């Protein structure tokens, strides 16, 4: 339906619009819009938006369009996030060990006093 010569690929969704050749492919969800040439392709679920040039096309797990519409920064830190989450549950365990450690040195002090 679109003139491929004048426009780039179109979005197969209701109310889709053609992108000029200088712009990237459109998003295919409500409020479809074309990305400027300096911006990357859009993600394609609800709230699709164009990613700035400093960001990757889309977030994991399935680029270039991911399930959750987000724009990822060039600095990929997906592996660091789960590590931080694992550290949080370890924190209370460390505190518990600290309490036990304080009790141990406290006991011998009590024994030393009656020994005198």
From Swiss-Prot:
UniProt keyword Iron-sulfur, yes or no: no
Protein's job: Involved in sperm motility. Its absence is associated with genetic background dependent male infertility. Infertility may be due to reduced sperm motility in the female reproductive tract and inability to penetrate the oocyte zona pellucida.
Organism, scientific name: Homo sapiens
Source organism, top-level taxon: Eukaryota
A GO biological process held by the record: penetration of zona pellucida
Membrane topology term: Peripheral membrane protein
Tissue expression per record: Testis. Is selectively expressed in the spermatids of seminiferous tubules.
Keywords on record: Cytoplasm, Fertilization, Membrane, Mitochondrion, Repeat
Listed InterPro entries: SMCP
Chain positions covered by the region annotation Disordered: 80-116
Gene: SMCP
Record localization: Cytoplasm; Mitochondrion membrane
GO cellular component, one term: mitochondrial membrane
Protein name from the UniProt record: Sperm mitochondrial-associated cysteine-rich protein
Biased amino acid composition, Low complexity: 93-104
Membrane-crossing residue ranges in chain numbering: none
